[in-house]
Design a protein with these regions (language model features):
Chain B
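N-terminal secretory signal peptides that target proteins for export/translocation
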Residues: 1-9
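Sec-dependent signal peptide recognition
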Residues: 10-18
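C-terminal motif of bacterial Sec signal peptides marking the signal peptidase cleavage site
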Residues: 21-24
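N-terminal "domain-start" segment
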Residues: 26-158, 180-184, 190-211
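A short beta-strand micro-motif
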Residues: 160-164
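Glycine-centered tight beta-turn/hairpin loop motif at sheet-sheet or coil-to-beta transitions
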Residues: 165-169
Length: 692, 211
């Protein structure tokens, strides 16, 4: 009901903005785009020029986002080198970075964490690209600045800020296949030291069905709203104040529950967060930054029949954070950052009897040392103390060495970790239809004792320890950057992530009624390693080519040992005979492609006013499940074939305030209905943009 | 349940191979009976209980020598859902058939064709606390894949070795737990608790070889 109200509000505000568009459009439309010296905040928690970074990173600019035609974060992120999106429940999309699973990449909006990992993966399709200024991606463990979850890397979505004086607006409407509609109203006003900005984005779709007649849609119809309201006030010597409120609301037909006739499945998500950021230059060399942040994520899944709710699943998480940091610069261009703060995280969830509360304090220090013109060394360390886990000490060291103006070497070592989540600690879930129980390690003793007392326990292999350790990694990156000519940067990066204490579900017991009891333990060690190459080329003024390639090996150490010991066999699907596998038959972890290739072609036409963008994204073969009875992915398994997805967008400027876009996603209509459920086939989109 | 006698198939298809096999047997000991290689398809071993409830229903008893399901005490092994009993040792529950023979068994790691001898030191009988063929995912002959597929898959390279109720030996490989042994089974649509397996039976007492 609230979203209907908001929808009306959007419509109204859109009409107001459109009717005003000619009155306010006074700014000169500049055709020339001046390439500003791009800066990145995520790598150092303070602005640093992109070209000077010591860690592997990538910026997706506002222009790239707008020209691409994409609406949601998962779509544009999957076009980046070395990044793959992996589908989860109900159309959700997680990110795989350097071959590391979605659970282990920290997602931030304006530097502050996004919560709501219902099943571990954070759904990137939740995040709208409307009003995004840029996206910063850091590869490699970064817990030295960000603490838990920054094991594979960090993705930071920077939203649009008010820069120019006066009244600004940006409105667009996009219509596409499956009745997909994306509408944005973005207005801002700045006068001297005061600015206010707000935007609201509504995105809806009828969803799609890849396999008809199975009684459920592949992706159910949904609608969501993303809103943002911000205030900025420059108090001169007293500093700057940013107050920001963001909301996300989504209604979706269909849930995690299996569809049955006569039962309506509904899913509802509400996300709210508020942040207050205070910045002040205390002296010529000292900067103070205070973030105060509170976010709340609520997801409700319901099965509804005419006389009530028959099944319900709730997930209600909140996080409060205070992060205070001081930056002290020296005359040589070096600086150090010292920061401290605390987190408070709470969860209420169906199948969790307790209401867990996690509190942690943290302290971090980073020194960015410019030893001379050629050598920049950045070293940092963070200490996290937690009320439920052992404390963590996360170091990171990175450097950049300039051999010449054209050639430099970058290297980094970082420690990353992820604390066990609430599920792994407190879940007490019983599935009566398929007959299994999953118990978190903090509740297992209690439940097992109860089962024993009731004579319901057949056997129980006591956990080695009920003290789950944080999953962690040591991540290494070494890269060369070479400017073939000033216009042709070429980058090659080698990476290796050693991951320890991966948490897995294991069978720990069985009830007398045959139900299997699962719990969690730290068992696996794995690694991901590979090479990443990327570059771009401007052969002629109107043409830009860019491309990238990633070679990836991602393997489980225990699996390697099993293959070496000669105890792994495979069953031939036709003859049903088993045969022994050799060490080199092991392919690696599920959902990993050995090869990934991206290629982009952009033409500027019509005196730089219009452009055409073509993208080809190749993903090499990968396996989703074991298909020959050995629980490992080996060369005789059924793989999902390597495939290319191609997009084209055409951006045309009509007048200085009006432009439009035609975007065709998956031009060649590549589909795999059984295995690639996140791909509905070819999609057409048309968009009209009004701005000043 | 359908039985296929591989030897008779081979006889029709490849007389030479059979001759070699026969000759090799003759060379060893002229009075030995030939070994029997069989495939059993769609042997139903269903429980009458619903998932999540205590398992119930009769065990299906099988004789390697008779190549079929039997009702009497001359059974060698018995099936119910994923549980396999041997006719030797002691019953662990009241609804199990009582053990009247000297059967035993173990799970060998290795391709079916490469396991040609019985290691008698590994043979175990059923007891009140453990079965000769261990139950549970990953412990014995199968893996339970858990959510979301919930498949029961026979682990590749697990050969079950049995001593029969009257002291002969057999080796066995379970190939499928679903009706008609589909190439890619689906736990939600394919009929489960239906075994397909092949076995080799050594009818000569005291001979531990399957060659």
């Amino acid at each position: 009901m609230r979203s209907k109200y908001i929808s009306k509000l959007i419509l109204l505000s859109t009409i107001i903005v459109i009717s005003n568009i000619n009155v306010f459009s006074q700014n000169e439309d500049s055709i020339k785009t001046i390439e500003m010296k791009e800066v990145m905040v995520s790598a150092n928690k303070t602005e640093k020029p992109f070209v000077e970074l010591t860690v592997p990173a990538k910026i997706i600019s506002k222009k790239e986002i707008e020209n691409s035609g994409h609406s949601r974060l998962d779509e544009i992120i999957s076009e980046q080198v070395g990044i793959i999106t992996v589908p989860g429940f109900g159309g959700s999309e997680g990110v795989q970075l350097q071959g590391i699973d979605p659970e282990y990449t920290l997602i931030l909006i304006d530097g502050l964490p996004v919560i709501g990992r219902v099943a571990g993966t954070l759904d990137l399709s939740r995040i709208s690209l409307a009003s995004v200024e840029k996206i910063e991606i850091i590869k490699g463990a970064s817990s030295s600045l960000y603490g838990s979850e920054a094991l594979g890397g960090v993705i930071n979505i920077i939203t649009r800020k008010v820069k120019d004086e006066g009244f600004k607006k940006n409105v667009y409407y996009q219509y596409g296949s499956y009745n997909t509609q994306d509408i944005l109203t973005d207005i801002s006003f700045r006068k001297n030291k005061f600015a206010v900005f707000g935007n609201i984005n509504r995105y809806s779709s009828n969803g799609y069905d890849l396999i008809e007649g199975d009684g459920q849609k592949t992706v159910e119809a949904f609608q969501n709203i993303t809103g943002n309201l911000g205030l900025y006030y420059n108090m001169n010597k007293l500093g700057n104040l940013n107050l920001n409120y963001k909301l996300f609301e989504e209604d979706r037909d269909g849930t995690v529950f299996i569809t049955s006739p006569g039962i309506e499945n509904k899913s509802e998500t509400n996300e709210n967060n508020i942040s207050l950021i205070y910045q002040n230059k205390l002296s010529k060399s000292v900067d103070l930054n205070i973030d105060i942040y509170k976010t709340k994520y609520l997801n409700k899944e319901q099965q509804v029949v005419p006389n009530g709710i028959i099944n319900e699943n709730n997930f209600d998480q909140s996080l409060s954070r205070v992060d205070v940091r001081l930056k002290h610069s020296t005359s040589s261009g070096s600086y150090y950052t010292i920061g401290f703060g605390y987190d408070n995280e709470k969860l209420e969830r169906t199948n969790i009897s307790v209401k867990p509360e996690h509190k942690s304090q943290f302290l971090y220090f980073q020194y960015d040392w410019k030893t001379n013109n050629k050598f920049n060394l950045v070293s940092g360390i963070r200490y996290d103390s937690h009320n439920k886990y052992s404390s963590q000490l996360s170091p990171k060291v990175s450097f950049k060495y300039d051999f010449s103006e054209d050639l430099n070497l970058k290297g980094s070592f970082g420690y990353g970790y992820k604390t066990p989540d609430f599920r792994q600690l407190y879940l007490n879930f019983s599935n009566s239809t398929s007959g299994y129980i999953v118990l978190g390690v903090s509740v297992i003793d209690e439940v097992i004792t109860e089962l024993q007392n009731n004579n319901e326990l057949m056997f129980y292999d006591e956990l080695f320890t009920t003290n789950l350790l944080a999953e962690n990694s040591n991540s290494y990156n070494l890269g060369l950057q070479y400017y073939v000519t000033p216009d042709i940067p070429l980058e090659i990066n080698l990476f290796r992530n050693n991951i320890y204490n991966l948490i897995e579900t294991n069978i720990v017991g069985r009830k007398t009624n045959g139900q299997t009891i699962y719990s969690y333990s730290n068992v696996n060690k794995a690694f991901t390693q590979g090479i990443e190459i990327q570059g771009s080329w401007n052969p002629i003024k109107i043409l830009t080519l860019d491309g990238g390639y990633q070679l990836l090996y991602a393997k489980d150490i225990e699996a390697i040992e099993s293959f070496q010991s000669g105890t792994v066999f495979a069953r031939d699907r036709i003859t049903k005979q088993s045969f022994e596998l050799k060490s080199n038959d092991y392919f690696g972890l599920y959902s990993r492609s050995r090869h990934q290739l991206n290629l982009g072609v952009s033409f500027i036409i019509n005196q730089i006013r219009d452009n055409i963008n073509l993208r080809f994204n190749y993903r090499g073969k990968f396996g989703l499940v074991d298909t020959n009875n050995n629980s490992f992915l080996d060369r005789y398994d059924n793989f999902i074939k390597g495939h290319v997805l191609s997009n084209i967008s055409f951006n045309k400027v009509i007048t200085k305030n009006i432009s439009f876009q035609i975007f065709i996603k998956n031009i060649f209509n590549y589909k795999d209905e059984v295995n690639l459920v996140n791909n509905p086939g070819r999609i057409y989109n048309f968009k009209v943009i009004l701005n000043n | 349940m359908i039985l296929i006698n591989i030897r008779s198939m081979i006889k029709k298809l490849n007389l030479l191979l059979l001759t070699l096999l026969f000759v090799s047997c003759v060379d060893d000991d002229p009075v030995l009976e030939p070994i029997e290689a069989m495939i059993v398809t769609n042997l139903e071993a269903k429980t009458t209980s619903q998932p999540g409830q205590p398992l119930s229903g009769d065990f299906v008893k099988f004789s390697f020598e008779k190549q079929t399901v039997v009702e009497g005490d001359d059974w060698d092994i018995a099936f119910r859902a994923t549980t396999i009993l041997v006719n030797g040792g002691f019953a662990a529950a009241d609804d199990e058939p009582s053990r009247t023979g000297i059967a035993a068994g173990y799970v060998a790691v290795g391709a079916y064709g490469s396991i040609n001898n019985v290691d008698e030191s590994l043979l175990k009988q059923d007891s009140e606390t453990a079965y000769a063929v261990p139950t549970g995912s990953g412990n014995g002959w199968y893996n339970y894949e858990g959510p979301p597929t919930h498949l029961i898959t026979p682990i590749a390279g697990r050969t079950l070795i049995f001593k029969t109720h009257n002291g002969r030996y057999a080796k066995m490989e379970i190939q499928s737990y679903y009706k008609d042994a589909p190439e890619s089974p689906n736990a939600f649509t394919d009929e489960a608790q239906v075994y397909t397996f092949n076995y080799t039976y050594q009818p000569n007492e005291g001979v531990i070889s399957f060659d």
